[in-house]
Amino acid sequence: MGKKKKKRKSSAFKIILNVFLSIFLVAGVAFGGIVFAMIKTAPPLNVQQVLTFDEPSILYDDKGQYMDKVITNEQRIVVDYKNVPQNLKNAFVSIEDERFYKHHGVDIKRFTGVILINVTNKIKRSSKLQGASTLTQQLIKNTVLSSEVSIKRKVQEMYLSIQLEKELSKDEILGAYMNSIFLGGNALGVEAASKQYFNKSVKDLSLIECAFIAGVPQSPSVYYPYSSASKKNPSIYLNRTKTVLYKMLDNGYITQNDYNKALKDLDSKKLAFAKPSAPSNKLAYEWFSIPAIEQVKKDLKTQYKYDDKQIHNLLVNGGLKIYTTMNKNLQDKTQNTINDAYYLNSYKSNGIIYPQASAVIMDYHNGEVKTIVGGRGDQPARSYNRAASYNYLRPAGSSIKPLTVYSAAIDSKKATAATGFEDSPIPNNIGRKYSSGAPYNPRNTPDIYYGYVNVREALMRSINVVAVKLVDKIGLNTSIQYAEKFGIPIDQHDRSSIASLSLGELHKGTNPLIMAQAYGVFGNNGTYTEAKLYTKVVDRTGKVLLEPKTNTKKVLSPEAAFITYDMLQGPVSESGTGPQANFGNMEVRGKTGTSSDMKNLWFCGLTPYYSAAVWIGNDNSSTVDGVYSSTAARLWGDIMKEFHVNLPYKQVQKPASVVTANVDRISGKLPTQLSYRDPRGSTVYNEFFINGTIPTEYDDIHVEAQINKLTGKLASKFTPSFLVESRVFLRRDYSPGVELLDQQWLLPYSIDEGGSLPPTEEKNNSNTRDKNKDKNKDKDKNKNKDKNPSQDKPNNNNNNNNNDNNNNTKPPENDSNQNHEDNKNKQ
């Protein structure tokens, strides 16, 4: 009986055992299948991805020197493994993975032990859990897998770690780990952490500094020394540092003496942290860097069809190398020149210096922009870029005239540099075309009218009413077309405003970058070269992503460009509005500009090397006191002087198709003998023309008339012969209603009606006659008349001069006998 019971118990045990074995076998097979499925869905191991770290893009100047870095919320500076101190390597291994050099990606012993500890803690309902990830696993997690917490991710992490150990050496794995790990604050990697905490390179860290950094990854926020908790209780991070040091001692990486000294240093507060600074979003050269980055973004979108998110990720994390056109040396000098311009009558408001100023200098031959300065003095991050932002446009004033008025007229052949105009108030028949109310009637600045002038002189003196008359002559549509060719932003309001197109009172405005590109046309055979802010963009593998071409378009004929270029020497001459722009012996051309109420002051110009534009004004568009457009010309000259150091003298070459001819500067027509006898001196000069535009008509403004030289009235039959004198005058067939500066040279309209001579004159004439009677009576009476100083001897001299002038093939372009007003502050 007893034997039967024992037999039954034995059979039952076997059955139960078999059942459990079967269950475990099935469970094992099932678990293995699940694990296999998890492994199968793991992403493929990309070793290059593991060794590649998210890095912000770097900008370099035109010499390949570091210039700026794209701002991100986190900073990473990749460091070469050989530059990491051995103490830091040993510290990480000791505290994070002490069997690192023995396992093959997964530490089975540690993994098993941690599982048992965590299960025990769970049973005890303890929240204290331990991790078992090796350095290799942490690297996989940081570079390949997501931060998801799941069994599946853990299995894939272990599998990929084993695979990675087959591909990389221990040094490569440890080096990649130290460059990828988050170390608190905004530091990614050990180099960024060294800069953040100790303001030094990782290679210069001490033992206790190495131990501190190695202790941070367990809980970066807890061990962050700048947190309020750590400031109140430094033992939080000090105890962690001591733990790392003990593990280094325990693993034989440091000696007992090293350990003791390190503890002593900690107790002596030798673990000194750098002064914390708030993460700055200000770039070192943000005036230039931000527009350059925007141009890169635009080109990435155009060439690769990337969306904004892809472009942002590429710039922030892609480690691109952006080679800009900026010259760091000249950028710094330009900034300093603008900052230190003592003649700008400066004052401060809310911490910002005023008036503000901005400048752009570019090589108009290849489009490379060398300098962008968007403001002067200390500026907050991402402040107004007054030089290059399309959100900060200002009216150009008279600096627009060479673009929309003078070059447009010459290129369209509707006027020449010699074409004559009358500088006088706008006639009502013209004014009514551009006003729904009272006729449009702009004034000159200052309120002076010169009378007869030609196009060249009108530009030199920046005569407003002539600019308006010329735009009326060529037509608003023609002016608009040229404005758009030059890249000037024209809105609907400007299209119907002659003030916008002739005087630069643009509704929105322009900026120095736009104007520097536009003025480059005059020195570049009429070709507009689009501004280029970078030359190349390279990805982290060295592949060239972008290499922009030089984009050009034809705006003017070479002939019109050269003639306008030559005319632009007028405004920088002593008789012009901006002679302060000149420097050295360099050939300078340019134009001042002032918008209404002195709110915006400009100088835009070029040399045979560079084009540049300078703006001065206040951010609130208020009147600028004590500063003029001539000040902008001076600032332009001071800046450009630095750009031309050691550059040889050079000229813009005249196209062979530009011809010359002698013309009358008053009428703009071919000269007559009277042109040489203008009472102010000869008005004949040699002018440049586009072939086929030389005038064919003769001067009809100069007229000759006989006058009573005593009264200045037209001579009549009542005028004594000895008072009759032949003189040359200007003809004007109407009254302009205001006084013109050439009015004194006009043909008189009053006729001499005779009358007695003044007593003194009668006496003198009587004495003269008596003396003549006493002389040889056989002499010719006409010869005696020649001796009388009241006779017309100056006419004979003028005739002699006329003969000389007729033999002169190229009279001087600027007549030094003319009386010029000092218009340095005039537009």
Swiss-Prot record:
Q: Where are the transmembrane segments?
A: 19-39
Q: Which NCBIfam families match?
A: PBP_1a_fam (TIGR02074)
* Annotated spans, Transpeptidase: 357-641
What is the organism field in this record? Clostridium botulinum (strain Langeland / NCTC 10281 / Type F)
What is the membrane topology here? Single-pass type II membrane protein
Spell out the Low complexity composition-biased ranges.
791-817
Q: Which residues lie on this side of the membrane: Cytoplasmic?
A: 1-18
The subcellular localization recorded is: Cell membrane
The molecular function terms of the Gene Ontology recorded here are: penicillin binding; peptidoglycan glycosyltransferase activity; serine-type D-Ala-D-Ala carboxypeptidase activity
- What biological process terms from GO does the record include? cell wall organization; peptidoglycan biosynthetic process; proteolysis; regulation of cell shape; response to antibiotic
Q: Which residues form the active site?
A: 96 (proton donor), 398 (acyl-ester intermediate)
Q: What is its biological role? A: Cell wall formation. Synthesis of cross-linked peptidoglycan from the lipid intermediates. The enzyme has a penicillin-insensitive transglycosylase N-terminal domain (formation of linear glycan strands) and a penicillin-sensitive transpeptidase C-terminal domain (cross-linking of the peptide subunits).
PANTHER family referenced in this protein's UniProt entry, alphabetically: BINDING PROTEIN TRANSPEPTIDASE, PUTATIVE-RELATED (PTHR32282), PEPTIDOGLYCAN GLYCOSYLTRANSFERASE (PTHR32282:SF33)
Q: What is its EC number?
A: 2.4.99.28, 3.4.16.4
Write out the topological domains of type Extracellular. Answer: 40-827
Q: Identify the InterPro entries for this entry.
A: Beta-lactam/transpept-like, Glyco_trans_51, Glycosyltr_51/Transpeptidase, Lysozyme-like_dom_sf, PBP_transglycosylase, PCN-bd_Tpept
Q: In which pathway does it act?
A: Cell wall biogenesis; peptidoglycan biosynthesis
Q: Which family does it belong to?
A: In the N-terminal section; belongs to the glycosyltransferase 51 family.
Q: Reaction catalysed? A: [GlcNAc-(1->4)-Mur2Ac(oyl-L-Ala-gamma-D-Glu-L-Lys-D-Ala-D-Ala)](n)-di-trans,octa-cis-undecaprenyl diphosphate + beta-D-GlcNAc-(1->4)-Mur2Ac(oyl-L-Ala-gamma-D-Glu-L-Lys-D-Ala-D-Ala)-di-trans,octa-cis-undecaprenyl diphosphate = [GlcNAc-(1->4)-Mur2Ac(oyl-L-Ala-gamma-D-Glu-L-Lys-D-Ala-D-Ala)](n+1)-di-trans,octa-cis-undecaprenyl diphosphate + di-trans,octa-cis-undecaprenyl diphosphate + H(+); Preferential cleavage: (Ac)2-L-Lys-D-Ala-|-D-Ala. Also transpeptidation of peptidyl-alanyl moieties that are N-acyl substituents of D-alanine
Q: Where is the composition biased (Basic and acidic residues)?
A: 760-790, 818-827
- Highest taxon, organism lineage: Bacteria
Q: Name one GO cellular component term.
A: plasma membrane
The alphabetical list of record keywords is: Antibiotic resistance, Carboxypeptidase, Cell membrane, Cell shape, Cell wall biogenesis/degradation, Glycosyltransferase, Hydrolase, Membrane, Multifunctional enzyme, Peptidoglycan synthesis, Protease, Signal-anchor, Transferase, Transmembrane, Transmembrane helix
Q: What is this protein called?
A: Penicillin-binding protein 1A
Its principal location? Answer: membrane
